[in-house]
Amino acid sequence: MGRFRLVSAGYTIIFFPRRADPAELSRRFLMLMNAFDKPVQSNTEQTGRGHGFARMFDRVCAFLDERVGGASALVAACQSVADRFWHSKLYFPVCFLMLAVFMAAGLPVVGGVLVMSTLIFLLLFCDDLLSILFPVVLLAMVGTEFYDELYSLLRFWWIGLLAAAALLVHIGAYARAPRNGGCMHGMVAVSVATLLGGLGFISREEYFSPTALYYSLGLGVVMLLAYLLCRSEADRARDYDVAERMLQILYAGGLFTGFVVALFYVRNLQEFLQDFATLYFKYRNFSATMLLIALPAAAYFAAHDRRHFLSVAFLYFMLLMTGSRSGLIFGTAMLLLCLAYVYYCNPERRAFYRRVGLISLIPAVALLIALVPRLFASRMVDGALISPDDSRYTFFIQGLLDFVKNPLFGCGLGSMHNAPIFLGVEGSIVWYHNLIAQILGSMGLVGVVGYGWLFYDRVRLLWRKRSRTTMAFALSYFAMLLISMTNPGMFCPMPNALLMVAMFVVVERQPDTAAVPVKVGSASTPERRLF
């Protein structure tokens, strides 16, 4: 069936062997994959679609018009609605409330189905793939209501098939041939590492178990495909600041996570009021991760509008309320970095910030000293927040021992030989709870090369694109690396790894900068950058 040329580092990928008339079939296949060979505008402005999948789609609509009538008008109306919704100020509030109301009412499945339906609608009728990212984050938050029984959600497999079909339609209608933006080679290396991890050690049953495949494929090949899909639309002209929209998605995801934590305490208010100590819930480390990477996004908007400092305070307080020690330690460090970021971005307000900082420093420290022992009383062991017998120490040593057992490929992401030490919730692998130990123990030297390559690509990209906006992305990435030192973090495919992939695709499209610009003037004026 010919060949599809992937424009990336000069490689040509042949998907199918040649048969019949290669030239003709190749031409048709390229027309299908490259449905739009020039930048397009929003859905409401697409009037000249005349080739590839788009032309075939128009013919289908014309056929339906003849048989049913009004199909083309209906599709055009749906495209207009999707486009207006994505670009409106109602997008985030509507998506947020769509799930929040039903979760508060104890009907998370209903809210999840509504969010998934919105995601499918946007895939079919919106040409901007970024529009589905916040619904994906919301769907991950639905899982907090089923944290002990995630497999029970498999009964909704049918709506997943509908979403997959909608994704294929979206790819055919809107995507173009992707190009490497700077991170692809590192992602290919990670894909190889996750697939080869455990070679010569892990059993066939463990390697091909559904949970193991979810992580080995989800962290590698699936993220690579997600990167290529995002890159296929990255060069299209937009009429909004894409970097700012990505920060809004991180910000909104953090706010919704804060809502989920607050909802838990509302449901268990009587128990909390007994001693004012944080309560245990199994998804606290996942919540801490989402809150932590959202802090820099909130700080970015606080640098523009001081009202967003309330959100910064809310996110940090919810980090404390998770009861996660990682949230306390890394959250405090990130809060200080975010405040320094706001200070740096507003030279005209620095004198005011210095006065506020000096006045509030002692009360803030005193408040933390008073609150932390009470809030984290349930986490204390012999008066210490971190016990020398903590399982994380055991797992770090175990990761090094597993690396010694099979230094080239490690023991594999799906290996269960450490289950007697610690076994997580249903649907999770046996974590080492440390980024370095996870790479060494699960993937060996191949993993070191893969993740080291990806880390180098991303850091180099952030340095080359450095600006006030990309500094916020750099802080979010740093937050993800921090939380990964004590928790799964970046080794959770959905939504953690996916958010990082989408974030760096946005960074790739930022202009190169020789130095970090300091914007002088009104801090309320946003820095506008377009693809």
Segments predicted by a language model, with ranges:
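A juxtamembrane structural motif centered on a specific transmembrane helix
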Residues: 6-11, 16, 26-91, 304-305, ...
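N-terminal signal-anchor transmembrane segment
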Residues: 34-35, 58-172, 199-201, 480
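Transmembrane alpha-helices of multi-pass inner-membrane enzymes
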Residues: 95-100, 293-296, 335, 472-485, ...
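Aromatic-anchored transmembrane helix interface
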Residues: 156-167, 183-201, 207-232, 245
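Alpha-helical transmembrane segments of multi-pass inner-membrane proteins
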Residues: 241-271, 281-344, 453, 457
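Flexible juxtamembrane loops connecting transmembrane helices in multi-pass membrane enzymes
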Residues: 275-280, 350-353, 366-398, 418-421
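Hydrophobic transmembrane alpha-helices and their immediate junctions
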Residues: 307, 443-481
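Long extracytoplasmic/lumenal interhelical loops at the membrane interface
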Residues: 382-397, 401-405, 409-443
